[in-house]
């Protein structure tokens, strides 16, 4: 009886042979379903396709819309401008690019990508902004005669570029699809 307690204690010490290692902190893994695109049509001078993950919300001005992505807490703000002449077009494009340049305070880089779809008369630039910028993507598209659409992608979360990267890449694909399917009426 007098040896039972020491023997049990010894057995407990010997039985604990598990190696303890520090486990890495888990990272959030953001995965989104493959998008299914549906047509957008209105009384405005354009049509395009957008993801079924987005909801269309009207803004206060006609032909201004918000594509709201509730799952990602993201929005694409679309603004349409009728163009009166070449100077008006140049001024609107300059305003769009000025808006991008104002983000250089927080952006670690700005990568412009021009696109040209002659068959549909869609021309423009997509800007990807890296770092802690308020916007992550900005674009404008025009037919260079009568129509211009400007768009910006915002996330309703603090700008933590690395954490948002999967969502930003998803939104970039959606914006590119919107641009590729954009048609003027």
Where are these regions (language model features)?
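Positively charged n-region of N-terminal signal peptides that target proteins for export
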Residues: 1-4
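C-terminal motif of bacterial Sec signal peptides marking the signal peptidase cleavage site
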Residues: 12-15
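Bacterial lipoprotein signal-peptidase II cleavage site
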Residues: 17-23
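Secretory pathway targeting signatures of secreted, lumenal, and periplasmic proteins
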Residues: 41-97
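Signature of long, low-cysteine stretches enriched in small and polar/charged residues
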Residues: 97-150
